[in-house]
Amino acid sequence: KKIYFYQKDLSLPDALKNFKKVDIVINLASLTDAEGSLKIKNQIYKNNLGIFNNIIKYCKKKSSKLIHISSTSVYGEQKGLVNEECKKLKPKSPYAEIKVKEEKILKKNINKIKFVSYRFGTISGVSKGMRFHTAINKFSLYAALGKPLPIWKSMMNKPRPYLSLRDAFKVFKFTIEHNFFNNETYNILSNNLTLKKIIDYFKKYKKIKIKYEESKLINQYSYKVSKNKFTSKAISLNSNIENDIKSTLKMLGSINNEV
């Protein structure tokens, strides 16, 4: 089949008016830097929430199914193992706040649209359009350039959910092929890892330096995110984050820090 690409500003109300029949919408049109969103709160609210509202309106009008991408960052500060039943979400950034708002909007429209909402962990892995603001990809770039890895010292032993692109693709494929639109929310991650574990992976393949920093987004508690709800109903998610680090460093192996 032919694939067509259209460049559209989805924040405009009529951006989708010429698309007459769309079976499934995958909404990836968001600014995604959680820490960076602190500096552009108004912009990210206007962009991300504006786009989401336009897409919801379109899906309702055209009866299109929606794959909604949320984030595990909606949990904020928690204790122990958290799952989708967690009632007290504590987002720590404008980006995460918007994801909570989007999920609430979906619940209000639960009888008007078919959807599935996925709370993605932090992405890792090689892609043609990859970005480098997420932890593992950023560390890979810095390591390749010989720069010190910017590490939040207070987070060294606190696990966080990470998602390999390989698993993300598997989720999209499964959802479409199995018509997995049951108007529910699922955590999507490959593994929970501490910064210490991630740094150990890097040390296997690269001589690295570390620079300790403080972040504006500091969680006081250590917690893990459960993926059992999705894996028990759908498919296993177990791609190796270490392999993502290895392949990313290999891809970046030819770059240097010369200007």
Where are these regions (language model features)?
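Glycine-rich NAD(P)-binding loop of the Rossmann-fold in SDR/ketoreductase-type enzymes
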Residues: K39-N54, L89, S93, E97-I98
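Conserved Rossmann-fold NAD(P)-dependent oxidoreductase catalytic core, especially the SDR/UDP-sugar
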Residues: N27, N53-P94
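Conserved beta-loop-beta element that borders a ligand/cofactor-binding pocket
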Residues: S71, E103-S127
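NAD(P)H-binding glycine-rich loop region in Rossmannoid oxidoreductase-like domains
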Residues: Q7-N47
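Glycine/proline-rich active-site loop of Rossmann-fold NAD(P)-dependent oxidoreductases
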Residues: V100, S124-K138, L165-R166, F174-Y186
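Mid/C-terminal beta-alpha module of Rossmann-like enzyme folds, strongest
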Residues: F139, A143, V171-I218
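Amphipathic terminal alpha-helices
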Residues: K227-N228, S239-V259
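Glycine-rich Rossmann NAD(P)(H)-binding loop
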Residues: I123-S127, I151-Y162, E184-L193, S215-Q220, ...
